[in-house]
Amino acid sequence: MKKLFASLALAAFVAPVFAATQTVTLSVPGMTCASCPITVKHALSKVEGVSKTDVSFDKRQAVVTFDDAKTNVQKLTKATEDAGYPSSLKR
């Protein structure tokens, strides 16, 4: 029983180590008016794991910080596309 408890306790402490926060920049060229960034920001903020979004109309981009254990770039681009604003990873 002690070994089981020790194993579970160790797993609980090790699991968060594998999760990492990432920040990516998405190109969102379809934003054509000042209210577009509001829609894009709302769509991205609804994705589980997203902790911060900064959407710029002037640069036509979104900078997104997220937990890569909960989401990924594909889910972020799908969220913007579903909101009517296709995006891609900016390199």
Swiss-Prot record:
InterPro entries the record matches: Heavy-metal-associated_CS, HMA_dom, HMA_dom_sf, MerP, MerP/CopZ
GO MF annotations in UniProt: mercury ion binding; mercury ion transmembrane transporter activity
First-listed, main subcellular location of the protein, grouped into a coarse class: periplasm
SUPFAM superfamilies reported for this sequence: HMA, heavy metal-associated domain (SSF55008)
Binding site for Hg(2+): 33, 36
Keyword flag Glycoprotein: no
Keyword Signal: yes
Signal peptide: 1-19
Keyword set, alphabetical order: Mercuric resistance, Mercury, Metal-binding, Periplasm, Plasmid, Signal
One cellular component term from this protein's GO annotations in UniProt: periplasmic space
Transmembrane segments: none
Localization, UniProt: Periplasm
Tree of life domain: Bacteria
Residue span, HMA domain: 22-88
Record function comment: Involved in mercury resistance. Acts as a mercury scavenger that specifically binds to a mercuric ion in the periplasm and probably passes it to the cytoplasmic mercuric reductase MerA via the mercuric transport protein MerT.
Subunit record text: Monomer.
Family assignment from sequence similarity: Belongs to the MerP family.
The protein, known as: Mercuric transport protein periplasmic component
Organism ancestry: Bacteria, Pseudomonadati, Pseudomonadota, Gammaproteobacteria, Moraxellales
